[in-house]
């Protein structure tokens, strides 16, 4: 069976093989009541920054505590970041379509997401909405990371305007990066684009 992936509780960074970690709150409740993790099952705890703790469940919802799960660390893995960094620049969209794009891109392996306030966007982030929107996208990326069993959570960058995005694209290409624009009227398929060799990106 494919192991479940959860966010670890405090102490994960210093955890060693044989240590016991306890998850509480909504993360543990979801694992116990929805995913129904049982004693003896494998669960991976990832911190979103490359640390993966391969664990074995030793207690799940004991004594009626459905918001508590304890696991023993069996293996500690530090997963390196991808050599080629993929960034999704996503225009704000209504009806949650932008969040769906963030979720799908995370599952496909994107390393960062940049929100873009295009001039013709119906959806607009202003004032307090900027922080709320970024937090919502970050939560979406975090959940999608667990769903895809990744060890790295994509970071959600600052909101860009079209002008600042143009500057970002120029800086990216000047430093050897490749920028692909996905457009419904594009004639060239994305599969035909030559990407940089990972060895050249070190």
Regions found by a protein language model. Name each.
Residues 1-78:
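N-terminal positively charged helical leader segments and presequences
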Residues 14-15, 35, 80-82, 170-174, ...:
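Solvent-exposed alpha-helices and their adjacent loops that cap or buttress functional pockets
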Residues 21-23, 83-87, 199-202:
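Glycine/charged-rich beta-loop-alpha catalytic/anionic-binding loops adjacent to active sites
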Residues 37-39, 104-108, 195-199:
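Short, solvent-exposed amphipathic alpha-helical segments in soluble enzyme
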Residues 47, 117, 183-186:
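Short secondary-structure boundary segments
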Residues 51, 121, 187:
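Surface-exposed, flexible loop/turn segments at secondary-structure boundaries
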Residues 78-181:
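RNA substrate-binding interface of SAM-dependent RNA methyltransferases
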Residues 176-202:
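Active-site/ligand-binding-proximal alpha/beta "capping" segment
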């Amino acid at each position: 069976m494919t192991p479940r992936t959860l966010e670890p509780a405090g102490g994960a960074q210093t955890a060693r093989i044989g240590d016991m970690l306890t998850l509480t709150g909504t993360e543990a409740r979801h694992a116990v009541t929805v995913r129904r993790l049982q004693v003896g099952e494998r669960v991976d705890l990832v911190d979103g920054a490359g640390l993966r703790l391969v664990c074995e469940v030793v207690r799940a919802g004991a004594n009626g505590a459905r918001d508590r799960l304890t696991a023993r660390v069996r293996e500690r893995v530090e997963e390196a970041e991808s050599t080629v960094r993929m960034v999704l620049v996503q225009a704000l969209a209504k009806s949650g379509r932008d969040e769906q794009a963030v979720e799908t891109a995370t599952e496909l392996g994107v390393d960062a997401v940049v929100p873009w306030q295009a001039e013709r966007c119906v959806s607009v982030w202003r004032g307090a909405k900027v922080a709320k929107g970024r937090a919502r996208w970050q939560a979406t990326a975090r959940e999608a990371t667990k769903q895809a069993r990744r060890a790295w959570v994509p970071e959600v960058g600052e909101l860009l305007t079209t002008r600042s995005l143009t500057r970002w694209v120029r800086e990216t290409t000047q430093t050897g990066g490749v920028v692909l624009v996905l457009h419904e009227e594009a004639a060239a398929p994305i599969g035909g684009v030559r990407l940089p060799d990972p060895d050249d990106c070190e």
